[in-house]
């Protein structure tokens, strides 16, 4: 990783200025060359160091400033937070989450979120947040103004993504629970040598609650390894997806039969997750643990 970071820095932007300073000084006044070398290499080292990619997440709470906000629907938005330097990355492994801290009436509250962005995105990170009237942290997000800050610590989580974890991922996401799924989907589909197939059951209340649908549909249309099926509680007329909740029957109809080569990934509201824990056991999958491990057949984020 250190070697890759080093090679990713455009060294020609260091060598050329250093050479010009030394050569120019030599032409004008040779006795100053020693000083010029010191100055040139100091400037070159500073330029090189500033150009390196730096991971900023740590176990200590850091403050990040809101730089942009994109409202998706009546209660959901994407919040973009600025990293200290334009070349910085968050340093969050795929499928893991960070802990967010906010102040509400003088009291600190926290909640975990998986960013939409990845370490391919430099200088910022994006959080997809659905705000609830009684949610201390999520409601605070809806009140944030550009320039406001949140506290962040991480990374957290037991998912350590790599090629070959399973032959088939059966994903079940509810609402903003799409975020870790989308990170994994992007990672798999961006690797043309990864044979993993993915089936996503994405559940929401209404059609307007389906966030990032354009991207999800585009990925499914582009790559045969990925299939998506939508589920709505309150569907519109002529709805072609499923209606109601994600049930045993729905899982059985869309996912492969339980096997060592299949993993079921779940992320969503607590009642939905609890129901799916029972449904997967009834279908023959191994019982999920309270805190999932990477080797589990059913992994709950």
UniProtKB/Swiss-Prot annotation:
* Name of the protein in its database record: NADH-cytochrome b5 reductase 1
Q: Which family does it belong to?
A: Belongs to the flavoprotein pyridine nucleotide cytochrome reductase family.
Q: Give the transmembrane ranges.
A: 8-28, 32-49
Quaternary structure annotation from Swiss-Prot or TrEMBL: Monomer. Component of the 2-(3-amino-3-carboxypropyl)histidine synthase complex composed of dph1, dph2, dph3 and a NADH-dependent reductase, predominantly cbr1.
UniProt entry tagged with the keyword Plastid? no
Q: Does the keyword NAD apply?
A: yes
Q: Which GO terms of the molecular function aspect are on file?
A: cytochrome-b5 reductase activity, acting on NAD(P)H; flavin adenine dinucleotide binding; NAD binding; NADH dehydrogenase activity; oxidoreductase activity, acting on NAD(P)H, heme protein as acceptor; transferase activity
PROSITE patterns per the UniProt record, alphabetical: FAD_FR
